[in-house]
């Protein structure tokens, strides 16, 4: 009977876990890393971005997002939406074409891959014959025209990827009709561009890289007109009236040609080099659009004078007498223009530019062409991210004040709404307001609305104004000088350069109830700031704190501290600094804690920790934790708190320098060289903090490097001296496994401004295994974590239980240990692992609840260096669930992880993107959206210039997708039946392929089974 009862108990416990815990990666925030292709559907109003890693991401109205991932690890080079369809085609670097669709399922859409195709060409053909360089999605929605490196144009029927061989355009067909005296006749080179006649879909313009352009009639299979260009062709634009063509070239010129039907046209009607007469770079893309406000808009990328501005990334916009060269800080990938009106044929309204590090949208209808603020795809890495901090359940008053401060900073943006509005966001409104704060290398802190799917920028705080830096305050990088030519104008916010790396933010702590903020930096600076709704000119009071306490024999060899401005500084509305603590030596601040009820800030570095009273502006205590053997702590910024990229770069630079110096000195001692390189590579691996080899928990010697480094600080009102009186206290954990406790005497509120705060050492714990202490939590008499400062005062948490025994939970890298207070006797412990070398990298307290029960449970959430997430019960410290989350090789992702109060988390998957995940069944933020097919699809009459019946068994619904998921599934099923050889014509095609006539038909039809990408969706 016992066994049966135990089994029932286990089942009940498993069900309880299922009700509370569920791991999901929900959405990616930020800007896609290494974008490589851009597409836009005017009918769907959806934007598509392909990346070098093979991802494809679709964006519409805020909250409408889709993501897919190609199986092939190849860059996406082109993205094309089928006109008036819900399908799109991607071309990869490996020359494969992929068909994707948005399919409705359970009242939401998913992005699915439904087919793939690779041109095979005739037997024995060289690869260039089928290497695709240009793609045209025909307006019929039924054809793809594929131009290749060898000059051929293949016609393929979609969505089944059936090659229509009789409609292909060979390079020989084109060459035979070119005048014999044309200089480029013998070698047309690759097809650079394909464009459909806007007035006659049966005519296509083929542009070859040597300069020849051919107007081809698809019905009659012959050329209509030749345009004999002599400069290398970059792009072509067909005017809306169908009577003129613009071509841009590699010498920085563009030409206008007239479509007359008279063959050939040897000279352009107009030729111009906008930034001549000296040699210019290529104009890679050109667009001209009519405007009711006067002359047309002429927009082109590139064309800059090669010698003077060849390194600039520019798009020029010319309209009437206005001419601007929009200057970006990263390479331009592609651009397009959004137009107003029915069928998007009206006035140009916005220029959308994808550059390597951001997406910029320019308002073309407002004077000055201001930038429209993006609600998503914001570059998180405008300056490199150095730390993150999440705050849940922000009070409405604080939220509105931060919003108002941000509005003061956004006056330079256009007031026009976001122009990309495809799809419907069906996700419910967020249940709470959440903030994500990111610290950056340039000394800024950015506030993001992290409540929903879109990570929206709210406010930016800059700390650089407090200090004297190398930047010239009169240096205005945003505007060109009067009369400058070309007329440059800086656009975008990506700025990879920092005025002074010492400004970098390392730690952030925000009190959501009081509006106080503490930020700490790379050069030992800790700023205390208060939210102010008005601009204010004030001094920042600086206090220098000597963490070495006058110890002799130590000499700081690292960076100098930042110079504080001694004059009053004008601070805009928002968070304004009023107090500064400067640590000496000016090492990286490794830990901070803020208690806004007591008005205290704790701070720690590799040398010790201190306590600062920001109410009375004085330092209360200092504790030096430096071990006499910690000589490395005097060398400068610590490798463990550097960016991973910097650590890797510096480590391998040392390796290279070592090898170079050895060669220079002609050292022939191979054994010595091998030993040195092995040591340096070992140092590099140590700095990378890779997963260690399998080992058991073992005691560490006290002479391990940086044992005095302070890893965590914690304020608690608990029993430290005796069990009858609780007192305020400060706890500190170090890299050497030591925990220090200080009892604080905080005067009552009415005497707080006059009486001093005092601190006295009370306890010291030394863990036997000396593993770094990464977290400290005090549990009340009921085993619950103590509430945040001011949380009880605002009636947002119950008062802690002070009658039972309190416990201190010490989280080291290798184990969790519970001590009773005030005796500090060990009660229980949990080893993270004994064999596989797992170490705790991130720890936080989170509250979990089921979807049906309002009751919440507190747990410990842990991320290890193996990339695994663990949920641990409190106060019993038992392992509840664990999930793999991050690859253990992704050191920067693990180091960047931040937990939320309700079981969610964020970590960097690239310098510009956060992955959001959830461990909770109750709190999940993910896209839930629907895209309806365009109206044209529902009453579409085929306008394809080439019509070929599909084989029996392939229904027309597959060609003209109606948006009905059931119909789509039936269609897909019938396509698969067709692929499974139920059709006579298929067998004939196979017979041909066996004879060598065609090799791709079967392969491509067998691949039409729908396959989901990495779908981000919320079906419940």
From Swiss-Prot:
Intervals holding WD repeats: 36-69, 76-117, 132-169, 193-227, 233-264, 282-324, 332-364, 386-462, 506-581, 590-651, 710-766, 775-827, 832-884, 898-921
GO BP terms: cell projection assembly; cortical actin cytoskeleton organization; cytoskeleton organization; epidermis development; establishment of spindle orientation; exocytosis; Golgi to plasma membrane transport; hemidesmosome assembly
Q: What is reported when this gene is inactivated?
A: In larvae, basal epidermal cells migrate to ectopic places and hyper-proliferate.
Which spans does this entry mark as compositional bias, Basic and acidic residues? Answer: 946-965
Tell me which Gene3D superfamilies the record gives: YVTN repeat-like/Quinoprotein amine dehydrogenase (2.130.10.10)
Residues of the region (Disordered) are: 935-968
The listed locations are:
Cytoplasm, Cytoskeleton
Q: What keywords are annotated for this sequence in UniProt?
A: Cell cycle, Cytoplasm, Cytoskeleton, Exocytosis, Phosphoprotein, Repeat, WD repeat
Record's InterPro entries? Lethal2_giant, LLGL2, WD40/YVTN_repeat-like_dom_sf, WD40_repeat_dom_sf, WD40_rpt
One Pfam family it belongs to: WD40
List GO terms (cellular component aspect). cortical actin cytoskeleton; cytoplasm; plasma membrane
Family statement drawn from the similarity comment of this UniProt entry: Belongs to the WD repeat L(2)GL family.
Per the entry, what this protein does is: Essential for hemidesmosome formation and maintenance of the cytoskeleton elements as well as cellular morphology in the basal epidermis during development. Also involved in regulating growth of the basal epidermis.
PANTHER family, sorted = LETHAL 2 GIANT LARVAE PROTEIN, LLGL SCRIBBLE CELL POLARITY COMPLEX COMPONENT 2
Q: What is this protein called?
A: LLGL scribble cell polarity complex component 2
Q: Could you tell me which species this protein originates from?
A: Danio rerio (Zebrafish)
